[in-house]
Amino acid sequence: NFQKSLNKKNVLVYGAGVAGRQLVIALENSPEFKVIGFLDDNDQLHRQVLLGQTVYSLSKLEKLVKTNDISFVFLALPSINRNKRNQINEKLNQYKLSVKTLPSISEIVDGRITISDIKDLNIDDLLNRDEVRPDTKLLNKNINSKTILVTGAGGSIGSELCRQIIRLKPNKLLLLELNEFALYKIYEELTVINKNLKIISLLVNAQDQERLETIFETFKVDTVYHAAAYKHVSLVEENICEGVKNNVFSTLSIAKASVNKKVSNLVLISTDKAVRPTNIYGASKRLSELCMQGIYEYNKDSSTHFSIVRFGNVLESSGSVIPKFKKQIKEGGPVTLTHKDVTRYFMTVTEAAQLVIQAGAMGKNSEIFVLDMGESVKIRDLIYKMINLSGFRVKDNKNQSGDIEVKIIGLRPGEKLYEELLIGDD
């Protein structure tokens, strides 16, 4: 037991409120962590002893880290906004501390929080803004009690769409996917979440218009979310024919089939890379948008409502650089960056899915919808933040004793320094 106590990592709990106290209780018998005290911004709590732990001000942090060999800080502030959390992270990162966080306040108050709920800081915290809250009426409008089909249902966007959809109580959910394993995986996940909903898995190529029309007619589909696409810029650049076939022809087939079988709503998932495209992927998605708008113009008397949604980069999606950066940091670096000034817009996968659903409820005339994602993010700053949040220091000319190096490798063919969301007033 003495040896085990020596191997424990010393931690501080940031937040001496209900969440922090619940966490200290949960950590009492932890074989891995030993609580040294609380940190809190409330002056009235400083120097008080709660549950046997002293409450310290942030001004004492440097001394605490040095004298107690602190490894981690657990954020027990589940109700604070993202800006405040970012400010706290910046302060903690000065001391090379690994920051971990907790789930919602309701789970803590209800006593449902356990030591296993402690996790690494959420990747969503990389956004320099709070998450955009959805309109509940819009979420329900085209889904509740209706038959929904999602193409690319096994992908990162498609699967999150499905997770959001099943919460809105559709009549049926059809999962259309060409990748067998991806289809199996999302089907298994969704059937566990909702055992009562009729979920149908369809191993189908979205370019097959005849098969699509059969499906739309057989199941009387009300709403289609077209998420199937190839998204990796460099791969599509090297596989132009397949990229165009999958991204453009599938949109044509879906749009024609939707009109022919009187589907009520069709939503195309597009990208900010479709704006003044400089690569094949962006061009293929812009062409997909034009196909949707062209088919709408040709079939104005149709009962099918078309809408288009443009995304920025979705955090932790299959096409995002974030998982790659995380892997490089975990392996000790270097983290590769194409250009020191490259910027991107970012959104969470939840925001992305909710935007798609709301756009489908608002769209009628093949309008293009975009999410207000605030200011674009400088990728170099994002990498530095990720390195710091992981408990490491950036190694550069100013700090040769740092842990992780950032290596500039040059822009890839077709890659922009910055993205736009709209072309003029389109």
Give names to the regions the model predicted.
Residues 148-166:
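N-terminal Rossmann NAD(P)H-binding glycine-rich loop of SDR-like oxidoreductase domains
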Residues 362-426:
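Mid/C-terminal beta-alpha module of Rossmann-like enzyme folds, strongest
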Residues 110-111, 226, 230-289:
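Conserved Rossmann-fold NAD(P)-dependent oxidoreductase catalytic core, especially the SDR/UDP-sugar
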Residues 301, 324-347, 351, 355-379:
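A conserved pocket-lining segment of Rossmann-fold NAD(P)-dependent short-chain dehydrogenase/reductase
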Residues 46, 53, 58, 85-147, ...:
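Flexible, Lys/Arg-rich cytosolic regulatory linkers and terminal tails that connect or flank
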Residues 2-108, 181-187, 192, 199-200, ...:
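A solvent-exposed beta-alpha-beta segment
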Residues 203-223:
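Conserved Rossmann-fold cofactor-binding substructure of NAD(P)-dependent oxidoreductases
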Residues 253-264, 277-306, 318-331:
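Active-site Tyr-X1-5-Lys
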